[in-house]
Each structure stands twice: as C-alpha cells, then as structure tokens.
Amino acid sequence: MHLEGKYLLKAPQAQVWDFVSKPEEIAKCLPDLQSFEMKDSRSFTVTVKVGISFVRGNFKFDFTLLDQKPPSHSRFEAIGKGAGVSIRLSASMDLKITEDDGTELEWQADAEMGGLLAEISPSLIQGSTSRFTQQFFDCVKSKLESSG
C-alpha cells in the first residue's frame, strides 16, 4: 500500500526539522501511543494500540532512521508486529521553505502487510490509515504552530 501527503506549516524549516528529527517529540503525536523507548541515536521502539475490524491490540514497531539530510530530508523504516499481523514500512519526508517562510512537509510511505491484515478489505485499511495519519499530522501542526 502506498500513502503520501503534503502539509503546510506556519513554522520555519529549521524549527520543523528540529521537531521532526527528534523521535521523542514525534512519538508524542502517534495516536494511541502506549510506550516509547529510544534504543540508540538511530533507532527507537513504540507500542501503539490498533483497532482495524477484527484486528485489535497493541502493536510494537521498531523504527530505524536510514538517511537524514538536515534540514530537508529524512528516511526511515519500521517493522511492526502484533495480534497475528506483521507490517513493514518504509517512509521518507522532505521539507521545503514556502514563499511566506513557512514549511511544506511532503511525505510518502510504502507498507507491506501480512498475517490477518490480508483478510481485511483494502478500503477499510486505507480509511483507518488515513484517519491515523491525519490525527498524527494535525498534532505535529498544532505543536509546531503553537510553539512558534
């Protein structure tokens, strides 16, 4: 499954980069976050509560930062497991300065899902994923624009 999106933020690129390059800050915006643990400077683990159709429970995701080019590009991967499901995610994010000195955050992600998720309608998964990402980016936007 491929996902992508753009968000306009009323915050300078340096401020956005400072926020999105800190896993402990990003984790605070994950909907239904249960736990967060930094493993080292390039990897961390989160546990989130998930509920899509009959797939419900806590999912553990191990994130690894693969490539960072401050202040404009980051790429990472995550491997998640829980409730008879496996997910492999690779994602990237690019930050661009806008004409009004704000920042455009453009992201894309590809997810491979196995186990019980294969039994669920793709449109149901897409809908749940869209709600999750909207909540996440609304939180990021709120934190950045209220701290500026």
Predicted regions and their residues:
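Hydrophobic ligand-binding cavity/cleft-lining segments
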Residues: 1-49, 148
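Hydrophobic residues in beta-strands and at strand termini
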Residues: 9, 48, 78, 95-97
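Short strand-connecting beta-turns/loops that link adjacent beta-strands
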Residues: 12, 41, 70-71, 98-102
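Glycine-rich portal/gate segments that line the openings of hydrophobic small-molecule binding cavities
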Residues: 37-79, 135
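A conserved amphipathic terminal alpha-helix motif
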Residues: 114-148
